Amino acid sequence: MAEEPQRSPAPTSPFAFTVPSNSLSELPDIPPDRPVLIAGPTASGKSALAARLVEDGGGAVVNADALQVYDCWRLLSARPSAAEEAALPHRLYGHVGARQTYSAGHWLKEVAGVLAEGLRPVIVGGTGLYFSALTGGLAEIPHTPPEVRAAADARLAEAGLARMVAELDAETAARIDLQNPARVQRAWEVLRATGRGLARWQAETAPPLLPLSDATALVIRPDPAWLAQRIDSRFDLMMADGALDEVRAALPDWDPTLPSARAIGAPELVAHLRGEIPLDEAVAAAKLASRQYAKRQRTWFRNRMRLWHEIRLP
């Protein structure tokens, strides 16, 4: 492994999670040079756990969250603060413009570069697809042409999710989350653009960049009621720290069809800034959206990460 720079202790974030001592005792023995993967739902404290492991054992905190890559969202995505990023090595945070195309394939290529640096990676996030691509490989699916993406946006808006599901090939429909509009639209686009279903492309997956057997994989499984309270409290902190101003800064170039617009709370606060709903309704809707997102994450992790070491909270 590469020689690491001297570090000062990591500062405390307004969203910081104090890792319970009983949770640290549940950790398996982790050799200092072994890659670590940490998955967990939003607001579960996974970023603080990653920082703790890097502070204690060295390495770099590597982002595996699809929204924390965007430069426009530090507060709404709960990205580490500037002070936290300066105190410990961090990679792949806030480096993508809001209007840029960024996919799991882009992330995987950048992670390959991070692994080549030689620092022990502690890869942390809530985007299950990133971890799946990292440890299981990712199919080389051709880029979706803009006209197909536009047609998919229009189809979803006009016909609805159920109709798009009905237009998928049976093999793909049996494998993806049919309640997730982004996943359904992506599968629809692939079928229209290539004439082959997403499942067929995925059957030609390349070898994984980091096989699960070569890493210590941790998944946080919080109590749902405990997590819901943390989600609500954290959003209040985000608002107090200037989340509304962050969204206001993004408003002139706001495009709801962009992946960056999927930041939890952004559509709701945009609606308020446009005079469509009162602030209290926007905040309540954002909190609800966060809790619903966390539920989807927990389901995904439960179904796909059965071989990962569980950390139960609180």
Swiss-Prot record:
Residues covered by region (Disordered): 1-25
Q: Which UniProt keywords apply?
A: ATP-binding, Magnesium, Nucleotide-binding, Transferase, tRNA processing
UniProt xrefs under InterPro entries: Dimethylallyltransferase, IPT, P-loop_NTPase
Positions that bind ATP:
40-47
Q: Which SUPFAM superfamilies match?
A: P-loop containing nucleoside triphosphate hydrolases
Q: Where is this site: Interaction with substrate tRNA?
A: 127, 149
- What cofactor does this chain's UniProt record say it requires? Mg(2+)
Any GO MF annotation of the entry: tRNA dimethylallyltransferase activity
Q: Which domain of life is it from?
A: Bacteria
Q: Write the Enzyme Commission number(s) for this entry.
A: 2.5.1.75
Q: What are the annotated disulfide bridges?
A: none
Any single biological process term in GO: tRNA modification
User: Which reaction(s) does the protein catalyse, per the Swiss-Prot or TrEMBL entry?
Assistant: adenosine(37) in tRNA + dimethylallyl diphosphate = N(6)-dimethylallyladenosine(37) in tRNA + diphosphate
| Enzyme class, first EC level, given as a word | transferase
Instruction: Please describe what this protein does.
Output: Catalyzes the transfer of a dimethylallyl group onto the adenine at position 37 in tRNAs that read codons beginning with uridine, leading to the formation of N6-(dimethylallyl)adenosine (i(6)A).
> What does the subunit comment say?
Monomer.
Q: Which NCBIfam families does this entry report, sorted A to Z?
A: miaA (TIGR00174)
Protein name according to UniProt: tRNA dimethylallyltransferase
Which gene produces this protein?
miaA
